[in-house]
Amino acid sequence: MSERKEQGIYAAFDMGGTFIKASLMNDSGKTVKGTFGIFPACSDQAAERILNRITEILLHMLADCPDGALKGIGFSFPGPFDYENGISYIKGLNKYDALYGINIREEIAGRVDERAKAFRKACSFKILFENDASLFALGECCKNKELQNTSVLCLTLGTGVGSAFLREGRLLKEDKDIPRNGWIYCCSYKGRRVEDYLSRRGVIELARERHISIREPAALYGMAVQGNETARRIWGEFGKQAGEILSPFMERFGGKDLVLGGQIAKAAVFFLDELEKTAGNRYRVHVAAGQEDESVFQGIYRLLAQEG
């Protein structure tokens, strides 16, 4: 008997602007063999086309599943988005604009239900939505037992800075000791937003101050790998600055662990020492290992399982 016939099943979708990554997960949070796929997103097309595309992918993955096996569908969706109610407010980004104001939960449930009726199958499952930073954080806690019974701030450092606060493996959104929704990007630091520092443009600006012109942090990382001392000092400055920005959040929250992910975290070998020096012994710093996609899918599973 196949894996998907033995256990309950969760469907996970990572809704990128260019591609949709999707997979089935079993009751243990493992990817069901042969179900992971990468599909064109059609994100610049009409709402009907996008919604039908999601439904087609889901039904294709579920083709061999028995009636009632599907326990939930989870989506990692970019914002702005009403994650609780499943409504997209993306506009002007040339991706998923056509879904603006649409209740995606209701639309997907209706399409799957209609198809199920045609095959006389019963449907009873939940559909949940969350942003990629929160799901990445949940996934990291799921993978690392050390993080499951503590207070964690998890960051994704890239074009912007995504953040999520967790306590004992659960996401916090409304808590007196954290920013609203757990989002630090819009908080103030030295008269500017945190995202102006802990992001692609923050690294580029630090490099420019040292008279190095780069278009991407990866270029500065490459220079540091090759032994360029100025590049290494810039990364050190980034780490020190990150520690100064993040330590007040950690202190107020009572955070014990800081997890770093995203493209910029790949350069952590050059900035981790300075970050840890600034942090002192107040909290531990971890750099996420493995593929970020894997953590997002693990996070979707964890979100659905917690809501079970």
Regions found by a protein language model. Name each.
Residues 2, 16, 281-308:
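Conserved glycine-rich phosphate/nucleotide-binding loop
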Residues 5-56, 60, 68, 87-92, ...:
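Short glycine-rich, Thr/Ser-proximal phosphate-binding strand/loop in the N-terminal lobe
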Residues 10-14, 70-74, 152-156, 259, ...:
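Short glycine-aspartate micro-motif
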Residues 18-19, 135, 159-162:
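Conserved A3 ("GATE") glycine/threonine-rich loop of ANL adenylate-forming enzymes
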Residues 23-25, 34-36, 46-47, 99, ...:
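Glycine/GP-enriched mid-protein hinge/lid loop-to-helix segment characteristic of carbohydrate kinases
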Residues 41-48, 52, 69, 81-151, ...:
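Glycine-rich phosphate-binding loop and adjoining helix at the ATP-binding site
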Residues 42-66, 192-196, 204-270, 285-296:
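Adenine-nucleotide phosphate-binding core of ATP-dependent small-molecule kinases
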Residues 78-81, 158-162, 264:
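Short glycine-rich anion-binding loops that position phosphate/pyrophosphate groups of nucleotides
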